[in-house]
Amino acid sequence: MFDSEFYNTLSQLSLAMAHKSNRNMSGNRKSVQKGVSAEFSDFREYMPGDDLRRLDWNVYARLNRMYIREYMEEKEAYVTILLDTSASMEYGEHKKYELATMLAAVVAYIALANMDRVVLVDTAELMRPLSVGGGKKSFPRVIHWLENRTFGGESELLSSVRKIPLTGAGVMVVISDFLQEPLLEEADRSYEKMLQYLRYRKQRPVMLQTLCGEELHIDMEGTRNLIDMETEDKLRVTMDAQAIEAYEKELFALTGRLKKGCASG
């Protein structure tokens, strides 16, 4: 998956980013510089990947919990990436999880190149995020984490988003097929709740939907037994032109609602 072609693409992306930076030296957001001499700003809870040298041992002694000291000059922008690792991501001739994993890598690479801190979470291990910073030199840790993900079982995005430990304002990138029963049954409300929650937590939501060709264009006719990859529930359906048209109409309506929800607010 992460072959020479992928790294060549990243190299081209890096050159394009450097070219854009040279054309607009001021940038679109404030640059951050790390330094222990800066003015103290706040505490935040320790996350795997943080520098243990920055633990506040006095706080640990009082509360028996690990907190990191942050300073005004070293407060990084946070980019949290939630990767859907449910069984449905294994569907398709070209597996959806392959594209999802590559998207996660690209987003992480761009964030690290911007000197942001990247927090990687998967839906199966919400309380075990990987937090990396320090620029592109930390990218191999991202690749190692992504290569060790396993896909299977069920996930529920709304509850997953609410369980992720967030450290402050930032960007939340959710990578999923978004084909989950709660979202499909009451899609408008579910998406609205998820997006409202993220904005309440001062996160700018970015939803990246990964679908395979077999889902976008149904190529089957007659009566079929369909099996849910996550729950193994079975459904007997008769596929004809009218049923396929209704399916595709609902699928693109679902995608449209998600896109509209992210664009608003």
Spans of features found by a protein language model:
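A positional/architectural concept
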Residues: K34-V36
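Exposed, interaction-prone extracellular/peripheral surfaces
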Residues: M1-R29, R44-D50, V59, I68, ...
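Switch I (G2) and immediately adjacent beta-strands of P-loop GTPase domains
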Residues: D56
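DNA target-recognition patches
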Residues: R53
